[in-house]
């Protein structure tokens, strides 16, 4: 089995845990998600500029004060280049044509309460989701029921994923980072399924500030 590419989702955060307060001046590497696809030594990067003004959280989430760089949602843009080019910038590259990257982006966005844009929150934000007693996570090849505990991540309540029909295989939502960390089924298996289904990539890698999640 040869690797067609690699997907890397990285979260960086800048938070003074010792003093339990944010820096007065936000750093340039504040919390952000970065999705990178590498195929045949060519990289395409999905990124969002920090500090871009946008309506806060679309009234779907309540939150405690965040790092200044994380108080706003940002718009994702694709940019070609290598990892050294991922500096904060106000420029926005046009959406690519003839690809399924928009499908990937929409699928990621749907994981956040059905929002039309993707949002992020650091583990220390105390974020809670209102009006949702369950989060449905549909995978094309997964069945059965699993539980995962959210009490230590994002302040969310427990959620239960129930079995779904394979006829719903095209309706896929992605677990949020906090949920994925505490999910008690094979995390890397889920990632492989998602990346292969969405991008045709057979090998996926996901990284967290607290390290690579291990399968349970």
Curated annotation (Swiss-Prot):
The SS bond pairs are none
Q: Name one GO molecular function term.
A: protein homodimerization activity
- State the source organism's domain of life: Eukaryota
Give tissue specificity per the record: Isoform 4 is expressed in placenta, lung, kidney and pancreas.
Any one GO cellular component localisation term in the record: centrosome
Kindly state a single biological-process term from the GO annotations of this entry: mitotic cytokinesis
Q: What disease is linked with this protein in Swiss-Prot or TrEMBL?
A: Uric acid nephrolithiasis: A form of nephrolithiasis, a common multifactorial disease characterized by stones formation in the kidney and urinary tract. Nephrolithiasis is due to supersaturation of the urine by stone-forming constituents, including calcium, oxalate and uric acid. Crystals or foreign bodies can act as nidi, upon which ions from the supersaturated urine form microscopic crystalline structures. Uric acid nephrolithiasis occurs when the urine becomes overly concentrated with uric acid and accounts for 20% of all stones.
Print the miscellaneous field.
Answer: Isoform 4 (talanin) of ZNF365 does not exist in rodents. In primates, a canonical intron-exon structure exist, with several stop codons preventing talanin production in old world and new world monkeys. It seems therefore that isoform 4 transcript emerged during primate evolution from a noncoding genomic sequence.
Summary of the function given for this chain in its UniProt record: May play a role in uric acid excretion.
Protein's recorded name: Talanin
Q: Which organism is it from?
A: Homo sapiens
């Amino acid at each position: 089995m040869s690797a067609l590419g690699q997907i890397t989702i990285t979260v960086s955060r800048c938070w003074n845990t010792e003093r339990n307060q944010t820096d007065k001046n936000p750093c340039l590497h504040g919390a952000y998600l970065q999705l990178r696809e590498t195929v045949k030594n060519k990289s395409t990067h999905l990124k969002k500029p920090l500090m871009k003004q946008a309506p806060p959280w679309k009234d779907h989430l309540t939150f405690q004060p965040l790092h200044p760089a994380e108080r706003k949602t940002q718009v994702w843009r694709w940019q070609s280049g290598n990892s050294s080019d991922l500096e904060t910038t106000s420029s926005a590259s046009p959406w690519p044509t003839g690809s399924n990257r928009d499908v990937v982006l929409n699928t990621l966005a749907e994981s956040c309460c059905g929002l039309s844009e993707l949002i992020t929150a650091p583990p220390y934000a105390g974020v809670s989701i209102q009006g949702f007693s369950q989060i449905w996570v549909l995978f094309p090849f997964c069945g059965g029921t699993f539980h995962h505990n959210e009490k230590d991540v994002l302040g969310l309540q427990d959620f239960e994923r129930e079995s779904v029909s394979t006829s719903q295989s095209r309706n896929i939502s992605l677990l949020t980072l906090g949920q994925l960390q505490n999910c008690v089924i094979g995390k890397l298996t889920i990632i492989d399924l998602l990346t292969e289904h969405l991008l045709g990539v057979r090998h996926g890698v996901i990284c967290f500030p607290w390290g690579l999640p291990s399968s349970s």
